[in-house]
Amino acid sequence: SPFEIEAGTVLMLEPEWARAGELRAQLLDESYPKPFVIDDGESRYLYFNVRLMQSQMSLKAPHDLALRYTQKMMGFLLFHPRPRRIVQIGLGGGSLVKFCYRRLPGVHITAVELDPDVIALREAFSVPPDDERLNILCADGAEFISTTEKGIDAVLLDAFDRNGYAPALASRDFFAQIYAKLSGSGVLVVNLAGDKETYAGVIGRIMEVFDDQVIVISVPDDGNHILYAFKERHFEPRWRWLNNHAKELRARLGLDFPAFVHKMERASKLNYAQREALRGR
C-alpha cells in the first residue's frame, strides 16, 4: 500500500501493463477515478479515495457485518422481521447484500449501483452471483425506484460517491417515490455520514414525507447516523415487546439487537431526529 495509514496490498481495476508509479501517484493525490481495494491479510477494504473507506470485509468471516453502521442498519428487522423483498441502493462492498442473502433465506434482494467499477469488484468481496433471490443492477437508484413495482418491505440506502452522500438521492421527490413503493409496513433505512448540515436536510425531508415517523440513532465509533423511517400509519413502537423480540433476533442473527432497541428508544424519547433536522433549516 502507498498509504501510511494502511498497510497491505492494493487491488485495482487496471491492466497488467499499467504503470505502477503513475497509479501510486494518482492514489496519493486523489486523482485516481476508480474505487480500489486494500487487503491487509485480515480484512479487505473498499475505498473511493484515501479519505473515504466505504466497506470492510473480514477474510475469516466474509459474510459477517464488520462495520458497526452496517450492523445497525439491520435494526429494521425489529419492526419487519420477515421481509420478502429488500432493495438496496448503493452496493459498496456488498456487506448488507451478503448478510441478507445468507441470513434471511426467504427474501429477494435487488441491489442498485450506479458505478460499474464498484460492481466489478463484487468477487473481491465474495458477493454471490445473481440468481432467483439476488439481482445486482447497474442503474440509477432514483430511476429504479420510480419504475419498480410497489411492495418493497425495506429500502436500504447507503449511497456514497467519492465526494460523500450522493446528492441525487437526497431530494424530497426521491423519498416520496420510496414511500409510495414501500409495503404498508415497509421501512426506509438510510446511512448518514459526513457533513451534519448536509444530512440534516435529508433528515428533514424524510420526516416531511413520512409524517415524522422517523428514528435516528448515532454510531459513535464510525461517526455515522442511521435513520429509520416507517410507512405504517400511526406507528407507535412497543418498546417492552421490542426488547423481548430483540433477544430472539440476537440469538437468530448474532447482532446486538437489544442494544439497538435501547438506542432507538432513547433517541425516540429525546426527539433526536427532530433536533438533528433543525440543523438543516
PLM regions and their residue ranges:
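SAM/dcSAM-binding transferase cores
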Residues: 1-41, 54-60, 77, 227-281
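The AdoMet/dcAdoMet-binding core of the Class I SAM-like
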Residues: 2-3, 9, 28, 44, ...
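Short glycine-/acidic-enriched loop or helix-start segments at secondary-structure transitions
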Residues: 97-98, 166, 199-200, 238-239
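C-terminal substrate-binding/active-site "lid" region of AdoMet-derived donor-dependent transferases
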Residues: 173-236
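S-adenosyl-L-methionine
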Residues: 44-51
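A generic structural signal for alpha->beta connector loops
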Residues: 106-108, 131-133, 185, 211-213, ...
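A short, flexible beta-alpha/helix-coil linker loop
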Residues: 51-55, 160-163, 188
